[in-house]
């Protein structure tokens, strides 16, 4: 009898522990699905993803894991299947990604690339404006020409800091140089760097702004990131008008990713009415204007 009682007590204890564990499992439910997204640094540095992430996670019971990269690096992660979706802003690189058969069609949009927000690029620089690009109604191309001319003339007060990282912003910068009549590789990246006025940072947008500020240099930035960092910078906006400065954000589901359905949920989420309204007001209380604008078919195009 003495030997039986301890065995019974042990069995009761084991059954109690099992019931507790099973009960906890039932309460907690299954672990959330993991969705990996590579995003541009501008969307991350502005804090937009910090706002969107918890809403998306709660709505879809998902663990959203975000990696902030330049567009070029983000798309490379999409090619290898290291992420399930990318949120980027370089139409030319996006088109190449889709042409390479790395993108999956978004179910509700019947296309691989879905635009969901936009803002504008601006040229910023020191208030002293040694290249003289402000207040003259210059186009972005004309402003770049003046910066190049002054830099090439060894005006030591004129410098330009580039992202230099194959990001969407870097792509836009190269497009402006090309539109201004320059061979980017030879005239800017080569001769400009040799002359010392053109500097490639190789960093994200926030870090590039800080570097340009420290060097009292010009740079190209999306307006949202500039507004988010403006309080800690001496740089000022100098040129902010021109069709070439349009900056459209798109989301693409990666064909080599492993969570298509949840990635498609992200696409639908970003275009949902309540999220579009959130984007329209994001940053207004702090900066007096939005850091991004919601999707507009007349500006961003379809879908």
Predicted regions and their residues:
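Secretory targeting signatures
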Residues: 1-30
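N-terminal segment of the mature folded domain
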Residues: 30-157, 202-203
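Extracellular/periplasmic juxtamembrane helices and adjacent flexible linkers that interface
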Residues: 28-31, 256-303
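Ligand-binding cleft/hinge of the Venus flytrap
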Residues: 52-58, 141-202
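A bilobed periplasmic-binding-protein/Venus flytrap-type ligand-binding module shared by bacterial periplasmic
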Residues: 121-130, 247-265
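Ligand-binding pocket segment of bilobal, Venus flytrap-like solute-binding proteins
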Residues: 174-240
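Short beta-strand->loop
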Residues: 104-116, 223, 227-245, 255
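Short secondary-structure boundary segments
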Residues: 90-91, 164, 221-224
């Amino acid at each position: 009898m003495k030997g039986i009682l301890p065995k019974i007590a042990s069995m009761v204890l084991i059954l109690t522990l099992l019931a507790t564990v099973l009960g906890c499992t039932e309460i907690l439910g299954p672990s959330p699905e993991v969705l990996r997204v590579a995003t541009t640094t501008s969307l991350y540095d502005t804090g937009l993803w910090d706002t969107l992430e918890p809403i998306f996670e709660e709505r879809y019971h998902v663990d959203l894991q975000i990696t902030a990269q330049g567009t070029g690096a983000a798309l490379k992660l999409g090619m290898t299947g290291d992420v399930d979706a990318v949120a980027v802003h370089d139409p030319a690189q996006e088109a190449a990604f889709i042409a390479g058969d790395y993108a999956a069609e978004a179910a509700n949009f019947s296309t691989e690339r879905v635009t969901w927000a936009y803002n504008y690029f601006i040229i910023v620089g020191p208030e002293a404006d040694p290249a003289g690009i402000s207040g003259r109604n210059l186009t972005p191309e004309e402003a770049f020409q003046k910066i190049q001319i002054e830099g090439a003339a060894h005006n030591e007060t004129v410098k330009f800091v580039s992202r230099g990282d194959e990001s969407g912003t870097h792509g836009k910068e190269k497009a402006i140089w090309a539109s201004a009549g320059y061979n980017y590789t030879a005239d800017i990246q080569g001769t400009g760097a040799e002359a010392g006025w053109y500097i490639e940072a190789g960093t994200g947008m926030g870090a590039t702004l800080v570097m340009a500020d420290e060097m009292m240099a010009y740079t190209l930035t999306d307006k949202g990131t500039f507004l988010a960092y403006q309080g800690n910078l001496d740089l000022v906006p100098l040129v902010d008008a021109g069709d070439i400065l349009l900056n459209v954000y798109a989301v693409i589901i990666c064909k080599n990713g492993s969570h298509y359905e949840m990635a498609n949920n992200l696409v639908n989420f970003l275009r949902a009415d309540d999220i579009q309204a959130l984007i329209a007001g994001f940053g207004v209380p702090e900066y007096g204007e939005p850091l991004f604008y919601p999707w507009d078919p007349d500006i961003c195009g379809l879908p």
